[in-house]
Regions:
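Secretory targeting and sorting signals
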Residues: 1-26
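Solvent-exposed, non-transmembrane regions of membrane-associated and secreted proteins
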Residues: 21-135, 141-148, 156-207
Length: 207
């Protein structure tokens, strides 16, 4: 991640959550050939290249459309969330529906997929009201647009002051598929009109 990406992530974290940027990948410089290939060799190489591309064609992982957490009775469709004009992460517009941070990782891909949900509303408990009740080993099921599903297992649940949001743990790339569920928690600041902390669930994909 570039220095600019780190600065952007740190700034956005103050609003609740942060965005992530793609990690750069360096490609080695090709070595010069020892001699010029013959036409037969070139044709053979071209055929091999065509075969390589045909077998390695990229199929993107379908987007998530639903989250189910049986142990705390959560069953919600997923709104797609992006970034607000000030480049902070959008929060779900509906208190009873969770949202997936679409510029980030798709559940099932290597990296940290992030799903947000409100803890309560003026009407009462919201979609992630019971998030703190999750325990290590609980299942989180994600259904994708093509009808496939992937299951994650809760590893830990933490609470952080919003001014100390763990950007690295939530958004930075991981080698394996992981999932983060985020809601508000802690003490409610009546003057500011929001909670002082975030509750974050860390989960890994079940193989």
């Amino acid at each position: 991640m570039t220095n600019g990406g780190r600065r952007l992530a740190a700034a956005a974290a103050l609003a609740l959550l942060v965005g992530c940027t793609e990690a750069g990948v360096r490609h080695p410089e090709p070595s010069p050939p020892a001699s010029s290939p013959t036409q037969d060799q070139a044709a053979s190489g071209a055929a091999a290249a065509r075969g390589f591309h045909s077998t390695r064609s990229y199929q993107p992982t379908p987007i998530p459309v639903r989250v189910d957490i049986p142990s705390i009775h959560v069953a919600s469709s997923l709104d797609r969330l992006g970034r607000a004009p000030d480049r902070t992460v959008q929060v779900p517009s509906r208190w009873e529906v969770a949202g997936w941070y679409a510029p980030g990782t798709r559940p099932g891909d290597p990296g940290s997929a992030v799903i947000l949900g409100h803890v309560d509303s003026k009407r009462g408990p919201a979609v992630f009201y019971r998030l703190r009740q999750l325990r290590r080993g609980d299942a989180i099921n994600i259904t994708r647009a093509d009808g496939s599903s992937v299951r994650f297992t809760v590893q830990r649940i933490e609470q952080y002051d919003k001014q100390r949001f763990p950007t690295d743990d939530v958004y930075y790339p991981t080698l394996t598929p992981t999932l983060r569920l985020v809601t508000c928690g802690g003490e409610f600041d009546a003057t500011a009109g929001h909670y002082r902390s975030n509750v974050i669930v860390f989960a890994t994909m079940q193989r």
